[in-house]
Design a protein with these regions (language model features):
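Short helical segment in ABC ATPase nucleotide-binding domains corresponding to the A-loop/adjacent helical element
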Residues: 18, 24-37, 47, 51, ...
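P-loop NTP-binding/switch modules centered on Walker-like glycine-rich loops
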Residues: 3, 95-99, 103-184
Length: 247
């Protein structure tokens, strides 16, 4: 039952393409393997489909690269191959787990542009998992922020970056170094992230929140809807956050 969901409905890109690709299989064979497992295509039709995906993800000389092994590719090319494998069965949704972490900045931008392009041309939904708020601002339509294993806020990207509701979201944005002078101290969130194996009685961020009240630690806090947004906070804020700007 899970095989019908994996790759066909939901597929995944891992953050480290070098360890995700099979080192003893050619690029073409790895894409064809997915096509054989999850589509009715066989033989030359399957290989033609694999070649088509290499073209879609922007691999140069795709016919030659079909016969290449992973060690012959650059980091950016390996990630493009991973994207081709993930999309070869034409899933409805793609989960991208830190897809640019192992890449340099210029290649990161290329991969993000590719994902945005494929989202539009292939009509797929993308769930991007990342710690990089700059990446979120660049590609996301909606943002879900997690803290200590819980979703604490969900909003459109525009609302999240201009008027975040949860104290953790607000503090996180204020801690961004962009636009600050070298002589300026960076704002930091006090305390440490709690251990996830402990028992929680209230808000998981309460111990680090400057605006926490006694009731924040007494009862489990649930996600509440505010318009088309959701926030896990008893006392959400709605005034704009003044973010650092570079001159």
């Amino acid at each position: 039952a899970m095989r019908n969901i994996r790759s066909f409905k939901i597929s995944l890109i891992f953050q480290e393409p070098a360890t995700s690709l099979n080192p003893v299989m050619t690029v073409g064979d790895q894409i064809v393997e997915t096509i054989l497992l999850h589509t009715p295509l066989r033989g030359e039709e399957a290989r033609a489909k694999a070649l088509d995906w290499l073209k879609k993800v922007g691999i140069p000389e795709p016919e030659r690269r079909m016969k290449s092994f992973p060690f012959e590719l650059s980091g950016g090319q390996k990630q493009r191959v991973m994207i081709a494998i993930a999309l070869a069965a034409e899933p409805n949704y793609l989960i991208a787990d830190e897809p640019t972490t192992a890449l340099d900045v210029s290649v990161q931008a290329q991969i993000l542009d590719l994902l945005k392009h494929l989202k539009e041309t292939e009509n797929i939904g993308i769930l991007l998992i990342t710690h990089d708020l700059a990446v979120v601002a660049q590609v996301a339509a909606r943002v879900g922020l997690m803290y200590a294993g819980e979703l604490v806020e969900e909003a459109s990207a525009r609302e999240f970056f201009s008027k975040p509701l949860h104290p953790y979201a607000r503090n996180l944005l204020k801690a961004l170094p962009e636009g600050k002078q070298k002589s300026q101290m960076l704002e930091a969130i006090p305390g440490m992230v709690p251990r996830l194996n402990r028992e929680f009685h209230g808000c998981r961020f309460a111990e680090r929140c400057k605006k926490a009240r006694p009731e924040c630690s007494q009862h489990k806090v649930v996600l509440q809807e505010i318009g088309d947004r959701k926030v896990r906070c008893l006392f959400p804020e709605n005034d704009p956050v003044e973010l650092p700007r570079s001159d």
